[in-house]
Amino acid sequence: MRRIVVKDFAIGPKEPLVIMSGPCVIESETHCLKAAETLKNMFEKYNVSLIFKSSYDKANRSAYDSFRGPGLEEGLRILERIQKEFGLAVVTDVHSPQEATTAGSVCEIIQIPAFLCRQTDLILAAAQTGAIVSIKKGQFLAPWDMENVIRKMESGGNSNIILVDRGTTFGYNNLISDMRGIPIMQELGYPVCFDATHSVQKPGGLGSKSGGDREFIPILAKAALAAGANCLFIESHPNPSEAKSDAASVMDFKDLDQLLPQFKELYELIQKQGK
């Protein structure tokens, strides 16, 4: 399995735990900077590597009038400031070849959303930025189907790939997590990250927005670590009830603070056993 180097740490076999975390969307510059500072301090306390995550545009909101974020230009300015002021690696979503090119020149990691993971032009544009590319497995794909996505990336000259499992469609307005997908995707040669927050979503389950079962985030995160996941993706917020996106499925900073040492201990135990 390929080892993906991010700043002064790496994602892959026998590497320390890495977690991507942050508010789902950039709500304001002040809010985003405070979130980054809080998470940086929290993760340093437990000696866990953090990749800060937030989106400049939530382009796939359920309703047309839902909050989407500050947009590409302003959002990237804020994320670049976080990278420079806090020394954090940053990951953000891209939705078009043009966005991939622009965001890839600013952010160390760009992410292909699950709904867009088969868009060839987007994949190739992301590959050609030279950035690390985190690709979410579509809810509609089998784990082994990601091999075709990988080949597209590699054909674009980029093998700095992180695969992300964020659940699989299970009837209407529901997702299920099949932990077999983690080792199956790892066999494709790249590290696998498990998205524990989007996996508890009820897509469109509240009519004009998605619902979710936040109480299952820790259970799925621990199950994924037990299955050998190389990384976790956990969107977080200082006050989930006030979150402007995915309020039902983001983790409270306070809960994340309590769970980080548990995640780390479990991850290290599994690594010692050679998973």
From Swiss-Prot:
Keyword Transmembrane annotated: no
NCBIfam families: KDO8P_synth, PRK05198.1
Any one annotated GO CC term: cytoplasm
Lineage: Bacteria, Pseudomonadati, Chlamydiota, Chlamydiia, Parachlamydiales
EC number of the protein: 2.5.1.55
Full protein name: 2-dehydro-3-deoxyphosphooctonate aldolase
Protein family according to the UniProt entry: Belongs to the KdsA family.
Gene that encodes it: kdsA
Pathway: Carbohydrate biosynthesis; 3-deoxy-D-manno-octulosonate biosynthesis; 3-deoxy-D-manno-octulosonate from D-ribulose 5-phosphate: step 2/3; Bacterial outer membrane biogenesis; lipopolysaccharide biosynthesis
